[in-house]
Amino acid sequence: MELSELIEVTRVRDAFMRKGPRPAQVGDICIFGHHLIFAPTTVGKEVPDNAEEFWLLHKAVDRVLCEPISKENPQRGGLLALKCKNFLLIIFEIGDLEICRATARTIESLSNINGFLHDYAFFYNSPFTILDDGWSAFDLEQEFARLMLSTDAFRISSVNENFAICPTYPEKLIVPKGIGDDYLKISATFREGGRFPVLSYFHKETKSPLVRCSQPLIGPTNRRCREDETILNSMITVNRGYIIDTRSKSSATAAKAKGGGAEPQGNYRQWRYIQCPIPRQREIHDALTRMVDVCSERKVTSDRWVSRVGQAGWLSSVAASLEAAANVAQCIYNERLEEVPVVIHGGDGLDSTLIASSLAQILLDADARTIRGFESVIEREWICGGHPFSLRNNHCAYAEGTVTGPFESPVFLVFLDAVHQMIAQYPMSFEFDENFLIFLFEHAYASEFGSFLGNCEKEKKDNGIRKKTVSLWSHVHHPENMKQFVNVCYDPTPGVIWPSIAPQCIKIWDRLFFRWQRPDNSWSTPETETIQSLADHWKLREKELIAKASSLRRSVVELSRELRVLSPM
């Protein structure tokens, strides 16, 4: 199929475009295979002050609406509304109603093509020189080499070569060293989707591994798999481990009736079972829809608006994700215990499991709070970890796909919002700022890069994505691009961070939900030099206070000595 076959209208002249509260512009709409381009009309050689050429990927459009300006007088033309996946609302006023409808049909068709083989990423030519190829930036062998500096308890297994055991896992995985591939194959038959236990993270300080997998298929008959038990028990050295289930008790019970379930205590005696529920896919999807609706509401009282924000359920989903991650981190980072293995799973291990495992790493590891370290977490846990981006992100808050509707959910956005909450509470502990998170959100839904294409590594390999497209990380790693994401106040915080999950501490992400409702300059931030100056001032002030505290401690010690000398025996 050629994309040109779907284009009924290639150009619409003299259309009015409105983007949120920004002033309307007059110009031409040009439609190509992958983009809609709005070119403002010039008057003679003069360009209006508010003129802005606007490019929009069709893939970024979530919903298309078309209606006449006046039902009583169709000759006045039509209104074309494009609701985008990044919550931008664009309205075009077109003088001819039939042309407006044809334009709507064209954009509707181009934005809802099944699959991803016609996506722009396959046709994009990078305008910059790739200095650091993102496709090879996070190699498993390199990760394993770093791991070997801390422990020799794991090995690389090629048991999933050609994706023979698990289609959603990569071909190479890090597994416990004393376990043979035959045990892994048997364990795969006992875990949902073949997702047997694999290493996700190793905490150097406490020597505690974080392992993820999917639910065990015990079913109503309490099926048992001794090989799976052996894999988990092989990680027990000194202390009992933890199995953390990201489902609610009712969900785990319902799953057992359908063939799934949770690890029975009688078979996994060296493990403590903990439930840290994160909302399910559908709940997250509906919560975002309600949240976006609330944030676009204008005619409502403050009390009613606050109530609706709470009822939307989005902030509670983010808080639940942070709470689950904090529980994982607490199990791993225990000052009294070392070598405490933690296994985490939900149902299929593709959504809430990845939220908890990746957030826990950011809490525990300062390296994960750098740009490159954060990318590594996303690459390992989400992209290689098998999160089905193409299914989950086919639509966002405004629409549902005819085929993919039941599978769509902004799970990755929950993760990004949770990281945003961490940045809000620890603004100097992250090398990147919220601009980077919004950038990742937008590219996860529509992008000229191939990183988020497909649902797993198998689909990437089958469709040649790594060979035919440019990695998003290649773009980020270019010095000219990276500087826009750097937090100038960054001051590395070693060790663990513990963000509060109290309701009053979980904030609405203004830059995400409200940025299109304000004029362009309302989100302007102080100049970099000003921010840097403030950061330097407070760093200097911190050093002064630390020095003063040390001096006071020395004075206390000296006074204590004098007191002992002067005090009678």
Swiss-Prot record:
Biological processes per GO annotation: endocytosis; negative regulation of autophagy; phosphatidylinositol dephosphorylation; pinocytosis; regulation of cell migration; synapse assembly
UniProt entry tagged with the keyword Cytoplasm: yes
Residue stretches in coiled coil: none
Membrane-protein topology: Peripheral membrane protein
Alphabetical list of InterPro entries matching this protein: Myotubularin (IPR030564), Myotubularin-like_Pase_dom (IPR010569), PH-like_dom_sf (IPR011993), Prot-tyrosine_phosphatase-like (IPR029021)
Residues covered by the Myotubularin phosphatase domain: 134-513
Family designation: Belongs to the protein-tyrosine phosphatase family. Non-receptor class myotubularin subfamily.
Oligomeric form and interacting partners: Heterodimer with lipid phosphatase mtm-6.
PANTHER family, per database record: LD06050P (PTHR10807:SF73), MYOTUBULARIN-RELATED (PTHR10807)
Stated name of the protein: Myotubularin-related protein 9
Gene: mtm-9
